[in-house]
């Protein structure tokens, strides 16, 4: 009986020490006290760009196998709608299949 009382008392002391009150001053960089504002931006849900147009997301590009891909022009990264992945017909066919799967999981309306 005394052992169970000691265990309960110890548990209560640990709980009081572990959970500080809300009145205590928050420490700078304390993640539990920081608040974050989340801004939801409207994103494109339907296609509006053709192959070769600049894009930001797959949803902007029209076509089942067209994705927003990255190319490098003069050392700078440029995103544009594209469907060709290779000069080899077999690899290009596989690439279009992968583009189709990528568009399937983009959840564009």
Swiss-Prot record:
Keywords recorded for this protein, A-Z: Disulfide bond, Ion channel impairing toxin, Knottin, Secreted, Signal, Toxin
Domain of life: Eukaryota
Disulphide connectivity of cysteines: 47-62, 55-68, 59-108, 61-81
GO CC terms in record: extracellular region
Coiled-coil intervals, chain numbering: none
Residues making up the signal peptide according to the UniProt record: 1-18
GO MF, any single term: ion channel regulator activity
Tissues where the protein occurs: Expressed by the venom gland.
Localization of this protein: Secreted
Propeptide: 19-46
Homology family: Belongs to the neurotoxin 25 family. F7 subfamily.
Record remark on domains: The presence of a 'disulfide through disulfide knot' structurally defines this protein as a knottin.
Function: Putative ion channel inhibitor.
Name used for this protein in its record: Hainantoxin-XVIII-7
UniProt organism field: Cyriopagopus hainanus (Chinese bird spider)
């Amino acid at each position: 009986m005394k052992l169970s009382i000691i265990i309960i008392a110890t548990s209560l002391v640990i709980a009081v020490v572990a959970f500080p009150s809300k009145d205590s001053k928050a420490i700078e960089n304390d993640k539990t006290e920081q608040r974050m504002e989340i801004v939801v931006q409207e994103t494109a849900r339907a296609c509006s760009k053709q192959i070769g147009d600049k894009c930001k997301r797959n949803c902007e590009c029209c076509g089942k196998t067209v994705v927003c891909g990255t190319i490098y022009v003069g050392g700078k990264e440029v995103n544009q709608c594209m469907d060709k992945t290779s000069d080899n017909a077999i690899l290009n066919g596989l690439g279009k299949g992968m583009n189709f799967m990528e568009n399937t999981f983009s959840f564009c309306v």
